[in-house]
Amino acid sequence: METLFNGTLSVGGRDQESTGFAWWSGNARLINLSGKLLGAHVAHAGLIVFWAGAMNLFEVAHFIPEKPMYEQGLILLPHLASLGYGVGPGGEVVDTFPYFVSGVLHLISSAVLGFGGVYHSLIGPETLEESFPFFGYVWKDKNKMSTILGIHLVILGFGAWLLVWKAMYFGGLFDPWSVGGGDVRVITNPTISPGIIFGYLLKSPFGGDGWIVSVDNMEDVVGGHIWIGTLEILGGIWHILTKPWAWARRAFVWSGEAYLSYSLGAVSLMAFIACCMSWFNNTVYPSEFYGPTGPEASQSQAFTFLVRDQRLGANVASAQGPTGLGKYLMRSPTGEIIFGGETMRFWDFRGPWLEPLRGPNGLDLNKLKNDIQPWQERRAAEYMTHAPLGSLNSVGGVATEINATNFVSPRSWLACSHFVLGFFFFVGHLWHAGRARAAAAGFEKGIDRDNEPVLSMKPLD
C-alpha cells in the first residue's frame, strides 16, 4: 500500500521521481507545466474571491446599523463604505444593499474562477505552448517574461484608474474631511502637480513627515492614482513592445523561482505600507469606519476632559498639571498651542473633528471657549473609549479600563496582520531569492531528498 511518506505516491500523475518534488511541495511540481500551473493560479484566485464574497455577506448578515462599524469587528464593509457605497453624512450607513450586491458579485465571480481552476487543473492541456502559444511561456524566455510583466502592469494601471473613475464620475468617495463630520463627495479637482504627488515619495518616513502615509486630502489620493495608473499603463505598453536591455538581461536571474522571489518581495513591501496606512492614516482609512488611530484616541481624551472641566469652571488656558506644565493646554516645540498631559507626544495629530478649532498658532483659545460643536464632543468621547490599543502602559495617557468591553480595533487587526504577513513574505523572498541565485550559479539543487530520514522508515501500516 502507498503511504504519504514512501516517495512513490503519485498525485495527478506526478511523483517525486519525475518532478523532483514531493507531493507536499504543491505547485513546485508544476513549474514546467504551464497549463496545470494556470489551473492552480485560477483556483487560488477563486479561493481569494470566494473568501471576499463570503466574508462580505457574513459581515452584512451580522451588521447592526446603530453601532459603529469598528465596534463590530468589520474589515470589509469599512472598505466599501470608504468607497462611498451605502453611507451618507457623518459616515452613517443609510443602505446596506450595495454591500449585499458586492458579496454576491464576488461569490458569482469565485464560481467562475473555481470552475476555470478545476478545468485547467484536471482537464485542460498540461502545457499551453503548443496549443495556445500566446498564453504559453518558458521561464528562461526573457522577451516573453517582459511581455507578461507589461500585461500585468497594464491591468494594475486600469485598477488604479477604476478608483479615479469612481471618485470623479460614479458617485464619489467618502471624504472624512467634509464639513460636519465627513460625507460622500465627488472629487472634481484631483491634484495633478507632480511636485505634490512625488513630494510624498521624497518625504521622510519618520515622525510628522510620514512619507505617502501622511496623505491627508482626497484630491491628493485621487491624483496619486491618476499618476500611478497612467505610469503603469505606459510602462506596461513599454514592456510589451520592447525587449529587455543588455544590462537587465545580465542583472536579473531569469527563472520561475526568481520571479517568485521578486513577487514575494513586492507583496511584502505592499503589506508593510498597508500596515502603516491602516494604523496611522485617518483619511483613506476614515476613523468613522475603522475607529480612531492611537494618537487620535489620545487627543480625543484630552479634548473630552477639557470640555468637561471647562463646563465645570476650570480655566483651561492657565491650569497647571502635576508636573508644572499645562494641564489642558501647553506649547509645542515650535510654539503652537497643543493639548497638555501625556498626549503632548501626539501634538502634530490632525483629525477632521479637531481641525475646525485650530487657528494660525495651534489650537485657538477663543474657539475652544466658544465654538465647540456637539458633534465634535460626541465624536471625541466615542473615539476616546475605542482606542486601538493592546497595551497596559505607554498608551499616550488613554485610560485603560480593565473591566471595559472587550474591544479590538479593526486598525489593530489590519496593522498587525499585515505586519506579520509582510514579514513572512519577506522571509520567503529571501529564501527563494537565495535558492534562485544559487541555482543560477550552478551550485545548488535544493535539499538532497535522497538522504531524507523519512524515506528509510517503514510504512505506517
Curated annotation (Swiss-Prot):
[CaMn4O5] cluster binds at E355. Residues 1-2 form a propeptide. The chain crosses the membrane at residues 57-81, 122-143, 166-188, 243-263, 279-300, 435-459. Keywords: Acetylation, Chlorophyll, Chloroplast, Chromophore, Manganese, Membrane, Metal-binding, Phosphoprotein, Photosynthesis, Photosystem II, Plastid, Thylakoid, Transmembrane, Transmembrane helix. This is Photosystem II CP43 reaction center protein. The gene is psbC. The modification N-acetylthreonine is found at T3. It comes from Tupiella akineta. One of its GO terms (molecular function) is electron transporter, transferring electrons within the cyclic electron transport pathway of photosynthesis activity. Its main location: plastid. Belongs to the PsbB/PsbC family. PsbC subfamily. PSII is composed of 1 copy each of membrane proteins PsbA, PsbB, PsbC, PsbD, PsbE, PsbF, PsbH, PsbI, PsbJ, PsbK, PsbL, PsbM, PsbT, PsbX, PsbY, PsbZ, Psb30/Ycf12, at least 3 peripheral proteins of the oxygen-evolving complex and a large number of cofactors. It forms dimeric complexes. One of its GO terms (cellular component) is chloroplast thylakoid membrane. One of the components of the core complex of photosystem II (PSII). It binds chlorophyll and helps catalyze the primary light-induced photochemical processes of PSII. PSII is a light-driven water:plastoquinone oxidoreductase, using light energy to abstract electrons from H(2)O, generating O(2) and a proton gradient subsequently used for ATP formation. HAMAP family: PSII_PsbC_CP43 (MF_01496). SUPFAM superfamilies: Photosystem II antenna protein-like. It is a multi-pass membrane protein. It is found in: Plastid, Chloroplast thylakoid membrane. NCBIfam families: psbC. Binds multiple chlorophylls and provides some of the ligands for the Ca-4Mn-5O cluster of the oxygen-evolving complex. It may also provide a ligand for a Cl- that is required for oxygen evolution. PSII binds additional chlorophylls, carotenoids and specific lipids. One of its GO terms (biological process) is photosynthetic electron transport in photosystem II. The modification Phosphothreonine is found at T3.
